[in-house]
């Protein structure tokens, strides 16, 4: 999530005017957001001649609009891991990151691999090698489809709640496309599933639960920052998504489909 932390400063150089606004600021009068107070801003910095740069001060809170444009991407990533609202605003509003789809696919592959690994670990097959190889490959595709359906149900639950509560979620019409991108980006914690599987130990199941909690916390912060809503509504939105996802898991298990994961918080025996 931390890529592009210095892109604003790098792109602004090379303008020949006396004072140059930030990139594309002319085409979008209020493209950016102050990371402190969430107020809209026309630019992040001004580029004077001879490479003299000055960070824009927010007119509302009198603080720098985005201090992170001077930070190293690693620092931004650490702040994002700590779920700081300022880091989330920088990433979501003041940078151009187009890896949402790729990150989503990769996270689903990680989750599918975890489920597939647990499924193979619990099954003992005596069939011929070719048949076993084909069955294992099919199981991986099935785990990927189940993980995708569960994530879709989770997102639908969140969007449904926010749509019902939209008069309370924002003063203006909420940008659900931006929210979807924010949810996909904030699910990056699922990448930790692979190390948890590779370095297997007695506490792997606990680690998987902690990863799940971390992803949910990141989603919670992404919803709160994107829509500028209070913690209660953001928490209820995540809870609604979890509820619909749990119903989907229960449906799969009632159909006697092994979802093959300890990663899910709710299982059939919980109902």
UniProtKB/Swiss-Prot annotation:
Signal peptide region: none
GO cellular component, as recorded: cortical endoplasmic reticulum; endoplasmic reticulum membrane; Golgi apparatus
Superkingdom to which the source organism belongs: Eukaryota
Keywords from the named record: Cholesterol metabolism, Disease variant, Endoplasmic reticulum, Epilepsy, Lipid metabolism, Lipid transport, Membrane, Steroid metabolism, Sterol metabolism, Transmembrane, Transmembrane helix, Transport
UniProt keyword Cell inner membrane present: no
Protein function: Plays a role as a mediator in the endoplasmic reticulum (ER) cholesterol and bile acid homeostasis. Participates in sterol transport out of the ER and distribution into plasma membranes.
Disease tied to this protein: Developmental and epileptic encephalopathy 38: A form of epileptic encephalopathy, a heterogeneous group of severe early-onset epilepsies characterized by refractory seizures, neurodevelopmental impairment, and poor prognosis. Development is normal prior to seizure onset, after which cognitive and motor delays become apparent. DEE38 inheritance is autosomal recessive.
Protein's UniProt name: Protein ARV1
Species of origin: Homo sapiens
């Amino acid at each position: 999530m931390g890529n592009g932390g210095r892109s604003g400063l790098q792109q602004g150089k090379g303008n020949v005017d006396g004072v140059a606004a930030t990139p594309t600021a002319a085409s979008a009068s209020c493209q950016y957001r102050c990371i402190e107070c969430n107020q809209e801003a026309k630019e992040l910095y001004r580029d004077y001649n001879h490479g003299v740069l000055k960070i824009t001060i927010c007119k509302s809170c009198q603080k720098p609009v985005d201090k992170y444009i001077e930070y190293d991407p690693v620092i931004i990533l650490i702040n994002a891991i700590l779920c700081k609202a300022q880091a989330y605003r920088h990433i979501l509003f003041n940078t151009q990151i187009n890896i949402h789809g790729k990150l989503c696919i990769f996270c689903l592959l990680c989750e599918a691999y975890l489920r597939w690994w647990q499924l193979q670990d619990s099954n003992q097959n005596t069939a011929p090698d070719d048949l076993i190889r084909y069955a294992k490959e099919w199981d991986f595709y099935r785990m990927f489809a189940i993980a995708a359906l569960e994530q879709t149900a989770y997102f639908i639950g969140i969007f449904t709640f926010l749509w019902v509560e939209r008069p309370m979620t924002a003063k203006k019409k909420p940008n659900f496309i931006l929210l979807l991108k924010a949810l996909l980006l904030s699910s990056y914690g699922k990448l930790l599933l692979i190390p948890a599987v590779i370095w297997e130990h007695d506490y792997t199941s606990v680690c998987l639960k902690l990863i799940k909690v971390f992803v949910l916390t990141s989603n919670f912060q992404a919803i709160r920052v994107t829509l500028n809503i209070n913690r209660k509504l953001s928490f209820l939105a995540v809870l609604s998504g979890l509820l619909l996802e749990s119903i989907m898991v229960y449906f799969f298990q009632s159909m006697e489909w092994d979802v093959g994961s300890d990663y899910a918080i709710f299982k059939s025996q919980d109902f």
